[in-house]
């Protein structure tokens, strides 16, 4: 029986023997295609080749492409684990012809691979094919050339309401390349329900599509008509998981070798005996998607691809919770996955530690809110009407407890409950509007500035130029002229001003004529033109005026030094922290540089010092900074660092600082690194889960910061009546003194608490003959509460004590039970239940337990609940 890895390799070997170049899988984050959330088909990396925008050195290719369908238009997430064949991650085997062979060879190749004794050797009588209704050519090849009997060939017409809309007609979009396709189905046998393609029972598990062969032979025009392509092409896809199920004689993909290995590993970790449990299938699927997304540069976050990853991780964690997981477990599956994936798992092995760290951090973070969120959901589900959960509850789970909507839907699905998604969207829209109204963005000139021209940027090598005013905008509309005192956006035919891009802020400076002075505060790019934003200081400016544009040189040089420093910083971060570091954002201004990057753990002080040393070493070496333009493929071969999600053209600008740093960049840079002067890191912090931020200063700003730090040290030493060298010792002495004073203060507090305890003993009530004291207190800290409880237990010998104290907007809870009563009332259990009422948690021994909370407004209700609960136990 062939393994998944063997089937994958057989496919590549077969097509390689037919003259196809084996092309590695592209990343799950599509390169140069911001329209696509994730790579979801084998043809994605060849899209520009099919469109004629890119040429490759081969006309035949074959791949084993990793794909994700979760989020966006292609979203299988909610079905994963509940069906035999839905996955978030899958591998698509493909063979492609770029104007080379066409229908005859494509069909022959597929049939030979499937049925030849040398390859998969499937029984021919088990295979059925579909063709587009009018594609007589494909029908004849299958019937007359290959020899498939007519009863095994099914014509499928337009079945989606419009012409050329069919399961057997493929299109790249509303216009562009399209054509008929032929699909191959495998018959799993009469023991499975289902009918042939085109019948009412086609969605059953008997006849399963295993291969789709698309014939790109037309170009759909805007009017819907089809024109023949001069060079027809072929795009095919064979689902590896489905074919493995066929070859291993099982009907469900989850019964194949890779999934069974993962399912058994999860079952072992969580001590689950039932290997058919749906949650095991969910987790086995999700570890594949999460691991490969992380290795391809995605990190958990609250937006875009990162949020899809977060949703998948949290769904897996919730299913682990259903199976009884008490601690982080998901990350432990990575080594098993890397091993079982064979050659496709090698990239996981290389970054195994990073993948596990990322998963564990996210898993532990969600675990903190999972239990409380599930409790809220369980309570809400008991109150639903018409089997519908309100969108308000779903939104609260999303907004407060981090529950993605599909995770809430997952729980509801198990109770046959649906979510009112319309009211959920109303809540989401309201939140977006709140965020929008609280932002500081001004007028959106992108919708206003529409100029049928292009501004030529000439500012890499000069700071001033003569140019022509080609457009003016003021108060959100186009104007012909602006006067003194008016704010405006000036568009020039050429400019030395750099417009904000790639994290680098826009230039400022002056635009002047003999009769006008216009102060430029910022420069932005609107489409293909540069907008110089500012105010007329004197005179007037009109369209057609010839002006002198002068950049603020000192400011530009400071910005430039900071931009070059970010490149050195990026390389130093990768050296010290690891190759997983990827830039996630930046700000390069004249005053500071800010750099966001992928990293799950905080950067230690020692690591920050090493990073700073490395950058300053490169500055002292005064490295030459080279700038070259080259095609994108050559840049990749040089090891150039590019940014995920950025779209690059065929020709790119490469900024190099010897071999220490090579990056694609359109910004301005120093000629030699020595011009940066000095580099000083001033902060490190978290921006979001999995993203850290550092801020740094260079040149004069760095020197001024160091002078200020030195001033603070001297002033502190003077205040403490010591010198700078003895300052730390002096602080240690003061800390010791404070500790002694605090200890003495606590002693007095305990005395006062004991006196208060004596008074509280008078507040005892009887519940079924048992002494009970339940009191709300003010300003008593947890240590003193414990003393008070101990005193009461000593005084009354048999008692149940519950205290809730509000101190500094927080709730301190304590439950004490004398040992003779702890078999009836468990202090740890009771304090945990009370804590839930005040937004907290806690626990402890049967005779003494403590907890905290963040919702003091609910303390009265919580104490009333405690009284009722005690009554029920006694």
Swiss-Prot record:
User: What are the required cofactors?
Assistant: Zn(2+)
Q: What is this protein called?
A: Alanine--tRNA ligase
Q: For this entry, list what GO says about its biological process.
A: alanyl-tRNA aminoacylation; negative regulation of DNA-templated transcription
Q: Where in the cell is it found?
A: Cytoplasm
Q: What InterPro entries does the record point to?
A: aa-tRNA-synth_II/BPL/LPL, Ala-tRNA-lgiase_IIc, Ala-tRNA-ligase_IIc_anticod-bd, Ala-tRNA-synth_IIc_core, Ala-tRNA-synth_IIc_N, Ala-tRNA_ligase, Ala_tRNA_ligase_euk/bac, DHHA1_dom
User: What does the record give as the function of this protein?
Assistant: Catalyzes the attachment of alanine to tRNA(Ala) in a two-step reaction: alanine is first activated by ATP to form Ala-AMP and then transferred to the acceptor end of tRNA(Ala). Also edits incorrectly charged Ser-tRNA(Ala) and Gly-tRNA(Ala) via its editing domain.
The main location class comes to: cytoplasm
Stored HAMAP family: Ala_tRNA_synth_B (MF_00036_B)
Alphabetically list the UniProt keywords. Answer: Aminoacyl-tRNA synthetase, ATP-binding, Cytoplasm, Ligase, Metal-binding, Nucleotide-binding, Protein biosynthesis, RNA-binding, tRNA-binding, Zinc
**Entry text on domains:** Consists of three domains; the N-terminal catalytic domain, the editing domain and the C-terminal C-Ala domain. The editing domain removes incorrectly charged amino acids, while the C-Ala domain, along with tRNA(Ala), serves as a bridge to cooperatively bring together the editing and aminoacylation centers thus stimulating deacylation of misacylated tRNAs.
First-level EC class? ligase
Does Lipoprotein appear among the keywords?
no
Q: Which SMART domains match?
A: tRNA_SAD (SM00863)
> Any idea which positions bind Zn(2+)?
563, 567, 665, 669
Cofactor binding, note field? Binds 1 zinc ion per subunit.
Pfam family of the protein (one): DHHA1
Q: Which family does it belong to?
A: Belongs to the class-II aminoacyl-tRNA synthetase family.
Gene source species: Haemophilus ducreyi (strain 35000HP / ATCC 700724)
GO terms for cellular component:
cytosol
EC number, UniProt record: 6.1.1.7
One of the entry's Gene Ontology molecular-function terms is:
aminoacyl-tRNA deacylase activity
Annotated signal peptide: none
Source superkingdom: Bacteria
Reaction(s) this enzyme catalyzes, per UniProt: tRNA(Ala) + L-alanine + ATP = L-alanyl-tRNA(Ala) + AMP + diphosphate
């Amino acid at each position: 029986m062939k393994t998944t890895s063997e089937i994958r390799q057989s496919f590549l070997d077969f097509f390689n023997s037919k003259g196809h170049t084996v092309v590695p899988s592209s990343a799950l984050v599509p390169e140069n295609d911001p329209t696509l959330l994730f790579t979801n088909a084998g043809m994605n990396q060849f899209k520009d080749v099919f469109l004629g925008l890119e040429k490759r050195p081969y006309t035949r290719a074959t791949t084993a492409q990793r794909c994700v369908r979760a989020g966006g238009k292609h979203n299988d997430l909610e079905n994963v684990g509940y069906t035999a064949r839905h996955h978030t991650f899958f591998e698509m085997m493909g063979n492609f012809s770029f104007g080379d062979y066409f229908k005859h060879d494509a069909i022959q190749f597929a049939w030979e691979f499937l049925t030849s004794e040398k390859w998969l050797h499937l029984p021919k009588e088990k295979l059925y094919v579909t063709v587009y209704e009018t594609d007589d050519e494909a029908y004849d090849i299958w019937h007359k050339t290959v020899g498939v009997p007519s009863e095994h060939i099914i014509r499928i017409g337009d079945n989606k309401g419009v012409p050329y809309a069919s399961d057997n007609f493929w299109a790249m979009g509303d216009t562009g390349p399209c054509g008929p396709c032929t699909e191959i189905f495998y018959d799993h046998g009469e023991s499975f329900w289902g009918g042939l393609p085109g019948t009412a029972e086609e969605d059953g598990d008997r006849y399963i599509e295993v291969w789709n062969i698309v014939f790109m032979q037309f170009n759909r025009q805007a009017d819907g008509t089809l024109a023949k392509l001069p060079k027809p092409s072929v795009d095919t896809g064979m689902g590896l998981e489905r074919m493995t199920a066929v070859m291993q004689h099982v009907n469900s993909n989850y019964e194949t070798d890779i999934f069974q290995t993962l399912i058994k590993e999860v079952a072992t970790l969580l001590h689950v005996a039932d290997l058919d449990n749906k949650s095991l299938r969910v987790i086995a699927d999700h570890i594949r998607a999460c691991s490969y997304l992380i290795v391809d540069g995605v990190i958990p976050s609250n937006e875009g691809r990162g949020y899809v990853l977060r949703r998948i991780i949290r769904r897996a964690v919730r299913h682990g919770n259903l199976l009884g997981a008490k601690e982080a477990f998901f990350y432990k599956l990575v080594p098993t996955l890397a091993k079982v994936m064979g050659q496709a798992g090698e990239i996981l092995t290389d970054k195994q530690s990073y993948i596990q760290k990322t998963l564990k951090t996210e898993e532990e973070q969600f675990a903190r809110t999972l239990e409380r969120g599930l409790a809220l959901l369980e309570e809400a589900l008991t109150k639903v009407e018409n089997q519908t959960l309100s969108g308000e509850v779903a939104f609260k789970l999303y907004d407060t407890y981090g529950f993605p909507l599909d995770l809430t839907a997952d729980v509801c699905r198990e109770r046959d409950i649906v979510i009112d998604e319309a009211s959920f969207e109303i809540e989401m829209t309201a939140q977006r509007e709140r965020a929008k109204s609280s932002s500081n963005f001004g007028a959106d000139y992108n919708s206003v500035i529409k100029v049928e021209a292009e501004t030529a940027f000439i500012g890499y090598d000069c700071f001033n130029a003569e140019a022509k005013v080609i457009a003016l905008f003021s108060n959100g509309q186009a104007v012909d002229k602006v006067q003194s005192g008016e704010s405006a956006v000036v568009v020039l035919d050429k400019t030395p001003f750099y417009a904000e891009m790639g994290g680098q802020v826009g230039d400022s400076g002056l635009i002047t004529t003999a009769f006008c002075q216009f102060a430029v505060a910022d420069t932005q790019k609107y489409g293909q033109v540069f907008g110089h934003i500012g105010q007329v200081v004197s005179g007037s400016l009109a369209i057609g005026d010839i002006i002198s544009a002068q950049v603020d040189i000192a400011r530009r040089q400071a910005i430039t030094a900071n931009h070059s420093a970010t490149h050195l910083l990026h390389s130093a971060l990768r050296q010290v922290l690891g190759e997983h570091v990827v830039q996630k954002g930046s700000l390069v201004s004249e005053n500071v540089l800010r750099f966001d990057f992928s990293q799950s753990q905080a950067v230690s002080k020692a690591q920050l010092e090493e990073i700073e040393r490395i950058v300053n070493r490169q500055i002292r070496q005064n490295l030459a900074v080279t700038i070259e333009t080259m095609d994108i493929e050559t840049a990749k071969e040089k090891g150039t660092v590019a940014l995920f999600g950025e779209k690059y053209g065929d020709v790119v600008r490469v900024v190099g600082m010897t071999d220490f740093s090579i990056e694609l960049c359109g910004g301005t840079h120093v000629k030699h690194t020595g011009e940066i002067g000095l580099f000083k890191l001033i902060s490190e912090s978290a921006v979001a889960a999995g993203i850290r931020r550092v801020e740094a200063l260079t040149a004069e700003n760095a020197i001024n910061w160091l002078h200020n730090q030195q001033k603070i040290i001297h002033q502190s030493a003077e205040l403490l009546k010591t010198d700078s060298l003895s300052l730390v010792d002096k602080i240690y002495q003061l800390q010791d003194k404070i500790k002694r004073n605090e200890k003495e203060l606590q002693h007095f507090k305990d005395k006062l608490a004991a006196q208060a305890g004596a008074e509280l003993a008078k507040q005892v009530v009887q519940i079924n003959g048992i002494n009970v004291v339940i009191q709300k207190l003010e300003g008593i800290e947890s240590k003193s509460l414990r003393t008070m409880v101990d005193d009461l237990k000593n005084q009354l010998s048999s008692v149940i004590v519950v205290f809730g104290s509000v101190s500094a907007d927080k709730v301190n809870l304590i439950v004490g039970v004398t040992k003779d009563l702890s078999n009836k009332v468990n202090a740890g259990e009771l304090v945990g239940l009370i804590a839930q009422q005040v937004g907290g948690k806690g626990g402890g021994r049967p005779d003494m337990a403590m907890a905290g909370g963040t919702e003091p407004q609910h303390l009265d209700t919580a104490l009333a609940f405690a009284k009722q609960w005690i009554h029920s136990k006694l």
